[in-house]
Amino acid sequence: MKNRLLLIALLTLAGCAPMIQTAPVPLTPLTNDAVVPAIRFETSADLRLDTGYTRTLARSSVWKPAGRLPQGTVYRPAGTVFTIEGRQVHEAYLVIQDKRLVGFYLPGEQSYSPLSMAVPITTGEIQ
């Protein structure tokens, strides 16, 4: 009986989603004289996270600049909440460098979560 319960527990743990990899990083706010326009996705972008979960960045979704990290410019969604998922669900902002999504800033944890492969994105500026 004990062995059976142990086996069930191990199988349950093996079925759990992996944790999202993060590293603490300070978000540098944009200065008043920094002109970073909001962006709008011109096409949808499907993302496959390292955790196995997928997310879609919807066509025409608007993202406003929230600050900078060494990894790129941080954008938060306008009028909605965007999340990424692993073992837990995390609110996430996009980190974009050279027209590529390189990872996510997790505001609740004040951490950066990189993508293993950057995703090319097509955006337009909003005035």
Predicted regions and their residues:
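Sec-dependent signal peptide recognition
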Residues: 2-8
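C-terminal partner/receptor-binding element of secreted or periplasmic proteins
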Residues: 98-127
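Bacterial signal peptide processing site
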Residues: 17-20
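Short, low-complexity, disordered segments immediately C-terminal to signal peptides
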Residues: 22-29
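Mature extracytoplasmic domains of secretory-pathway proteins
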Residues: 33-97
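C-terminal motif of bacterial Sec signal peptides marking the signal peptidase cleavage site
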Residues: 12-15
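Intrinsically disordered regions, especially transient/low-confidence alpha-helical propensity segments
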Residues: 1-2, 60
